[in-house]
Amino acid sequence: MALSNKFIGDDMKMTYHMDGCVNGHYFTVKGEGNGKPYEGTQTSTFKVTMANGGPLAFSFDILSTVFKYGNRCFTAYPTSMPDYFKQAFPDGMSYERTFTYEDGGVATASWEISLKGNCFEHKSTFHGVNFPADGPVMAKKTTGWDPSFEKMTVCDGILKGDVTAFLMLQGGGNYRCQFHTSYKTKKPVTMPPNHVVEHRIARTDLDKGGNSVQLTEHAVAHITSVVPF
């Protein structure tokens, strides 16, 4: 378990607000949740409102990796490693992430996380383009993310993350996406060594249209156990 930050308790709340557009479909997402930062677990519920009304026009899974994998304070870090993310508070931090999908779909997201009392406030924007009309995203054929690893690398005074992730598909098969993320703190912090974060998201649909969703995440950081020659 990471060393504690007096501003971050064992149990914390979260609120979310996202504005975005995917293939010309504008939407807003609001959510709330709670979790245990030092254990690397969290659960949240989200409600999507389409600008033109009606059910969600694409798979919610492409948004879930902004909300989950989207506040790295909820990652279990060992006491031997500086926790870049928890050190950032109460000042806050920003994230920038690009998503490149195997069928040409591309998305970008940016968000700010601030701390108000025992609650993280997560405010984001999301833009996605070039998703094929008959592809897994627009046809809503994805069933959630396979567990994956994020490689964390210190670069130019910030932490950068790289993930090759796979969405699972109805009927079997996978759909590949590459994430690239820049994590920026608003104050200087002690940098960790290069390391990996092992993480898993689980999605539960709360309505048939996909507009209401529950997400849970478990994330653990560690240094590779492979011994150098």
UniProtKB/Swiss-Prot annotation:
Pfam families: GFP. The modification 2,3-didehydrotyrosine is found at residue 69. Changing residue 217 to Q: Shifts fluorescence to 495 nm. It comes from the Eukaryota. Tentacle tip. Changing residue 165 to M/I: Shifts fluorescence to higher wavelength. Contains a chromophore consisting of modified amino acid residues. The chromophore is formed by autocatalytic backbone condensation between Xaa-N and Gly-(N+2), and oxidation of Tyr-(N+1) to didehydrotyrosine. Maturation of the chromophore requires nothing other than molecular oxygen. The precise stereochemistry of the tyrosine has not been determined. Changing residue 199 to T: Shifts fluorescence to 515 nm. GO terms for biological process: bioluminescence; generation of precursor metabolites and energy. Belongs to the GFP family. This is GFP-like fluorescent chromoprotein amFP486. It comes from Anemonia manjano.
